[in-house]
Amino acid sequence: LDMDLLTQKRTFEQTKKLVERTQICSVPGLTFQAQLSDRAGNVLRITPGQGHTYLERPGYAVMTNFSPYKGDREKHPWMGLDRYQAARELLEAAHETFDVGDCFAVLKASSQTVCPTVVSMVYDAQQNKVFWCENREWQNIGCRQLENDESRQGAGLQLS
């Protein structure tokens, strides 16, 4: 689903319609959970075999290492319920001028050490930029400007 978005074979809206009419299941030996967002700030959360949730322009959306449909009923060492709760508390207390730096502060405060966080990403919709850091190297933030390309089908975005 998200690969089709990245390769511009499907738009966010097309993905949303697909999830609404088709039960999404993991393939044998592979499991995934997706949280997709469009430039307008809408969020589509997909947990194969369990369901999906569409959030229209939420103030924030936190992705988890556990099923949002099971919550704390299922325990495993990497689930990170404490990190999820810390991130939610920081985001609940966020101020109006919350920016990319503040986002990385939340990601840093909730990064995982048991199974170390490999990539942390922030998308700034106003600047149309993606920021990321790898391996919790918070001092090395990468940045990529996205450009609109209306001549291409799909999401209409490409890396420059």
Question: Language-model features: where?
Answer:
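Compact, glycine/acidic-enriched structural inserts
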Residues: L1-I24
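C-terminal, well-structured catalytic/ligand-binding subdomain of enzymes
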Residues: L1-T7, G29-F32, S37-S160
